[in-house]
């Protein structure tokens, strides 16, 4: 049988060898985990490998669904050669790859790695076996939807009426891998480890790689001061300060916030799996649209997403596609409606309107009112 066939849900036979390719972005990884559970439920005797990232390696190593893992973004002079050798050894030990599922299918690295695996079936992005061009999506809508340029709109659901029940990326991934009948895509499960410090009552995360999603720091200050007056301890989480400035648009905002409020600084003090533990232990987490939002929602902590989207979901973030679907997650509603980001398919880094009105349309009182509503919870009542 020829290799690199488009997957259409076929049986894979006894003890299949399946490889899932994931993203280096935290949010992408988190929403990939239902696929892993679905594959394990559908193919209980499978050997499941995961080609992921050094960024999320601690999560990947702790997932019970994963039998082996490697990082496609490892650095070093011989990293590519070592990865090739490792993948060859996995195929020697577990047999040829029956199915490759690329959940980072627009990444040229993962699309190149799929032919290296020489799988019988492919779900998601891949180059052809000769590496000279992309493997066609095929006619099955569970694969061909990847060619659609607009996953966040209501019209997307109209185009795939009867297939998808929502725009949520975890659901799309589960359909892509033909496991939507084997797992609840809304339920995200992440392992966690407690961090080496006393976790404050409230954790906040203020920054993101897209500046269009940044909430003004003076609004954060009002939230922190208000909650501190209740007697709550508030902690700031994120990457180390230098990375926050270089990659996540913090500018001097976080330093100002730390200097002018009772906020405690925990940036750079956790691994991702320890961040999950901190979120699990906290009373609540408030975050802009970024990786910590997805982690907090996944571990079941009351989580509030600060997004510049109006009551109908129009705004700075593709929330139809990305907002967690768990009951513990709530979001802000901006009083300003702007579709400029959606018209750009959210590819713009900065706000396209003077004054950033969508994010300024989120008042601190929304977050404060939400925090008041959970103020009666005990610290560990949701564990």
Predicted regions and their residues:
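Catalytic machinery of carbohydrate-active enzymes
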Residues: 1-383
């Amino acid at each position: 049988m020829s290799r690199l066939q488009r997957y259409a849900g076929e049986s894979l036979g006894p003890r299949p060898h399946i490889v899932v390719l994931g993203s280096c972005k935290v949010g992408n990884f988190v929403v990939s985990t239902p696929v892993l559970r679905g594959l394990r439920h559908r193919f209980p005797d499978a050997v499941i490998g995961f080609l992921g990232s050094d960024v999320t390696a601690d999560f990947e190593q702790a997932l019970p669904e994963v039998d082996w893992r490697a990082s496609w973004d490892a650095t070093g002079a011989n990293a590519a050669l070592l990865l090739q050798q490792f993948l060859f050894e996995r195929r020697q030990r577990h047999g040829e790859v029956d199915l490759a599922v690329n959940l980072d299918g627009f990444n040229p690295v993962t699309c190149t790695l799929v032919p290296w695996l020489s799988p019988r079936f492919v779900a998601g992005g891949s180059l052809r076996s000769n590496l000279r061009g992309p493997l066609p999506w095929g006619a099955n809508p569970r694969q061909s939807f990847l060619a659609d340029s607009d996953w966040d709109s209501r019209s997307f659901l109209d185009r795939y009426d009867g297939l998808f029940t929502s725009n949520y990326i975890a659901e799309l991934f589960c359909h892509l891998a033909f496991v939507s009948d084997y797992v609840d895509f809304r339920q995200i499960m992440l392992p966690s480890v407690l961090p080496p410090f006393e976790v404050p009552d409230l954790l906040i995360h203020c920054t993101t790689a897209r500046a269009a999603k940044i909430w003004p720091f003076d609004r954060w200050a009002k939230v922190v001061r208000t909650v501190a007056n209740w007697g709550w301890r508030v902690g700031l989480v994120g990457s180390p300060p230098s990375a926050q400035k270089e990659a996540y648009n913090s500018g001097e905002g976080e330093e100002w916030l730390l200097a002018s409020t009772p906020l405690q600084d925990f940036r750079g003090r956790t691994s991702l799996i320890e961040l999950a533990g901190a979120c699990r232990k906290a009373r609540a987490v408030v975050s802009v649209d970024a990786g910590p939002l997805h982690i907090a929602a996944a571990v079941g902590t009351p989580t509030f997403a600060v997004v510049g989207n109006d009551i109908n979901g129009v705004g700075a973030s593709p929330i139809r596609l990305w907002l967690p679907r768990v009951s513990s997650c709530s979001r802000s509603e901006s009083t300003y409606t702007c579709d400029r980001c959606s018209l750009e398919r959210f590819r713009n880094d900065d706000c396209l309107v003077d004054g950033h009105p969508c994010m300024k349309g989120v008042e601190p009182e929304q977050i404060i009112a939400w925090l008041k509503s959970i103020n009666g919870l005990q610290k560990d009542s949701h564990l």
